[in-house]
Curated annotation (Swiss-Prot):
The keyword Magnesium applies. Cu cation A1 binds at residues 161, 196, 200, 207. It comes from the Eukaryota. Cu cation A2 binds at residues 196, 198, 200, 204. Binds a dinuclear copper A center per subunit. This is Cytochrome c oxidase subunit 2.
Length: 227
């Protein structure tokens, strides 16, 4: 969950998000080192009047500044490709949930159950209870079992939407006429909030997403009560 004046990412709740945080730190370190080197060279150029004339034609220098950036790009690309393949990999999901974007709410269907569907609307500010979050609470939460592989099928009934939950490292476009999929695995129980992340009209900011991750026994009781 985000908090006021937060500068970093939300706490990782899935293996994918943990990998993304590590990749972010890895890349940020490379960017910091490159920026420091460039600033150091610029400061030297501005503070000295000496000129090394042979540097302009040095083949060794040209070789270094060609090979070194290539190595740096490889060091960035390889971890990125690994995470991309991990995000696309879906092996034997325990549960499949289909979500459809509408103007301006989400609908959910648990495809492993015969008749378990519902719509999820934002709760207006005037109806919020003490302790609830403005613009983030919904009337029907998406209850899912933790520590299990869940496949999310995402599409749209009207315009472009995007189903995003930052703490789980999820952001998948909901495109009319196309079915996208993503994997969801939570390592701990709790409430996880997200929002539509694609501008979709006047009420775009009123499309929150709330996932309630619970132990399997609690999920079985909830699903039985919904049928």
């Amino acid at each position: 969950m985000a908090y006021p004046f937060q500068l970093g990412f939300q706490d990782a709740t899935s293996p994918i998000m943990e990998e993304l945080l590590h990749f972010h730190d890895h890349t940020l370190m490379i960017v910091f080192l490159i920026s420091s080197l460039v600033l150091y060279i610029i400061s030297l150029m501005l503070t000295t009047k000496l000129t090394h004339t042979s540097t302009m034609d040095a083949q060794e220098v040209e070789t270094i500044w060609t090979i070194l950036p290539a190595i740096i790009l490889i060091l960035i690309a390889l971890p990125s490709l690994r995470i991309l393949y991990m995000m696309d990999e879906i092996n034997n999901p325990s549960l499949t949930v289909k979500t459809m974007g509408h103007q301006w709410y989400w609908s959910y269907e648990y495809t492993d159950y015969e008749d378990l569907t519902f719509d999820s609307y934002m709760i207006p500010t005037s109806d919020l209870k003490p302790g609830e979050l403005r613009l983030l609470e919904v009337d029907n939460r998406v209850v899912l079992p933790m520590e299990m592989t869940i496949r999310m099928l995402i599409s749209s009934e009207d315009v472009l939407h995007s189903w995003a939950v930052p703490s789980l490292g999820l952001k998948t476009d909901a495109i009319p006429g196309r079915l996208n999929q993503t994997t969801l695995v939570s390592t701990r129980p709790g409430l996880y909030y997200g929002q539509c992340s694609e501008i979709c009209g006047s009420n775009h900011s009123f499309m929150p997403i709330v996932l309630e991750l619970v132990p399997l026994k609690h999920f079985e009781k909830w699903s039985a009560s919904m049928l």
